[in-house]
Regions:
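Conserved phosphate-binding catalytic cores of ATP/NTP-utilizing and phosphoryl-transfer enzymes
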Residues: 1-2, 115-147, 237-247, 307
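Active-site nucleophile and cofactor-binding loops and adjacent substrate-binding regions
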Residues: 119-128, 151-152, 299-304, 395
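Short beta-strand-loop/turn "lid" adjacent to the catalytic site in phosphate-handling enzymes
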Residues: 56, 75-108, 256-272
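Glycine-rich phosphate-binding loop and adjoining helix at the ATP-binding site
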Residues: 94-130, 276-287
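Helical "lid/coupling" subdomains associated with nucleotide-phosphate turnover
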Residues: 21, 46-72, 180-450
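Short acidic, glycine/serine/threonine-rich loops at helix termini
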Residues: 21-22, 31, 100-104, 129-133, ...
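Short beta-strand segments
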Residues: 11, 91, 150-151, 258-260, ...
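Gly/Thr-rich phosphate-binding beta-strand-loop-beta motif of the actin/hexokinase/Hsp70
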Residues: 1-37, 136-174, 448-450
């Protein structure tokens, strides 16, 4: 028995905007009389939009109206109605997520993503999505090799170190193809603030490839430091993206470097330096000539589309099948996660008092709990929440806990208990209507840079 979910991935980046429509096949992987175990078994891409330049009113403001028209047109071309989309992700990435009107863009696009809306991708989430979408995670799992994936976009480079098919750590550097822009004659039109002290060019200067190359070399050196191929200097910290943790340089002796993002296409083939009106072509060729490509390296199976495929196909999870829900107004969108250090009514009250609206309480739970353990948890949660309980567990006990809460809070209370979903502090959840016995869930990290 299988179900089909229609999914959309929309990536609004510093340089480009693109969409992917895909179908996710959901199947029960359990056998016989076992508890149902629902998994996303297959991902089929049904439509790819062209890659568009992200519409901007100026260097600081995304044109939300033009972006909405672009998205509506792609839905029309794909032959897909908004109401037929079940799941997916709108990801605002790179420098675009720090534009002053990022929230307005989200508002303008929110009704295009079916039952799911993902806001801005923090550096960690964007790195994970890019590594998965580019095939770097699959490559590591298939070959057993350790991979450092670099998704080099317009404003930032998202890093992910992958060992045996598992992402160990992530990072983000202010290295990208649109940090320096030119008109058709080579006159500088924009210099990103992150290049302060690193670039001798300023808007209005007439530039040549020879003047641009040193800037590309500096950016490439930061990537080499992250890969452990160059001795670390303060440059690495200087170019670390605000909001991203420090990425300790790799120490692996055998490391495959994988590339995706718009600049990755410029690594593979040499293009005229003003092809895109930015530093991208020169940066790509500088990387190609650097230590990053001196050993084993590979271009992702998807380069410029890596993040959006990750959003459309990899952000959706399914809860366990023994869930409990009562009077829940599905879909729930952008509900903050509060990780509990202990399950006491005092802690629950204190943590919920910090929230402006509803929050999902997350804790590991107990493996194969007895009746008394479940009852004790339910007593504390019922007393702490005061009538509305949204719970996320790692252990398979959501149904038992939900039933115990319903006995204490009554038939009119809003109760949601899901399990088999791993979250962390600072995450947000979207929870959709039931698919068979499980619930579709999107775990998100929302960070709007200042």
């Amino acid at each position: 028995m299988s179900d089909i979910l229609r999914s959309v991935g929309l990536d609004v980046g510093t340089t480009s905007t693109q969409m992917i429509f895909s179908e996710l096949t959901v199947e029960n992987k359990a056998s016989g009389f076992a508890v149902p175990e629902m998994e996303i078994a297959r991902r089929d891409i049904r439509y790819r939009s062209p890659v568009y330049f992200t519409p901007l009113l100026d260097e600081s403001h995304v044109d939300a109206g033009a972006l909405r028209e672009l998205v509506a047109e792609e839905y029309r071309k794909a032959g897909i109605r908004r109401e037929s989309v079940d799941t997916g992700a709108i990801i605002i990435t790179g420098e675009t997520s720090r534009k002053e009107n990022a929230r307005a863009v989200l508002d303008a696009l929110s009704d295009f993503a079916g039952e799911f809306v993902v806001a801005t991708a923090g550096p960690d989430l964007e790195s994970v999505l890019a590594a998965k979408g580019a095939g770097a995670v699959d490559y590591s799992q298939r070959t057993g090799k350790t991979v450092l994936h670099m998704d080099i976009g317009g404003g930032t480079s998202n890093l992910a170190l992958i060992r045996d098919g598992k992402i160990e750590r992530t990072g983000c550097l202010n290295v990208g193809g649109r940090l320096l822009k030119f008109d058709g004659g080579g006159t500088v039109t924009y210099v990103s603030p992150v290049l302060t002290g690193l670039c001798g060019l300023k808007p209005g200067d007439k530039a040549s490839p020879g003047q641009v190359k040193p800037v590309a070399e500096i950016l490439t050196q930061a990537l080499e430091m992250a890969a452990g191929l160059r001795e670390e200097t303060p440059l690495l910290e200087q170019l670390t993206t605000r909001g991203a943790g420090r990425f300790d340089p790799c120490r692996e002796k055998e490391l495959v470097i994988s590339f995706s993002g718009g600049v990755a296409d410029c690594i593979e083939k040499e293009l005229p330096w003003l092809e895109f009106g930015d530093i991208g072509p020169i940066l790509g060729q500088t990387i190609r000539e650097s230590r990053l490509c001196g050993g084993e390296f590979t271009l992702g199976s998807e380069t410029i589309r890596a993040t959006v495929i990750g959003a459309g196909c990899h952000s959706a999870q399914l809860s366990g099948s023994t869930v409990f829900h009562q009077n829940v107004p599905f879909p729930l969108k952008n509900v903050p996660v509060v990780s509990l250090a202990d399950i006491s009514r005092e802690t629950i009250r204190r943590e919920l008092s910090k929230q402006e609206d509803s929050a999902i309480l997350a804790f590991p739970g107990v493996n194969s709990p007895g009746y008394r353990e479940v009852a004790a948890m339910a007593e504390e949660i019922a007393a702490g929440t005061g009538g509305k309980a949204l719970i996320c567990l790692e252990q398979d006990m959501a149904k038992a806990l939900g039933q115990a809460l319903a006995l204490r809070l009554g038939p009119n209370a809003e109760i949601l208990c899901i399990d088999r979903v791993k979250v962390s502090e600072g995450s947000y959840l979207d929870v959709g209507a039931p698919v068979g016995p499980a619930l579709p869930v999107v775990v998100k990290t929302l960070v709007l840079g200042k």
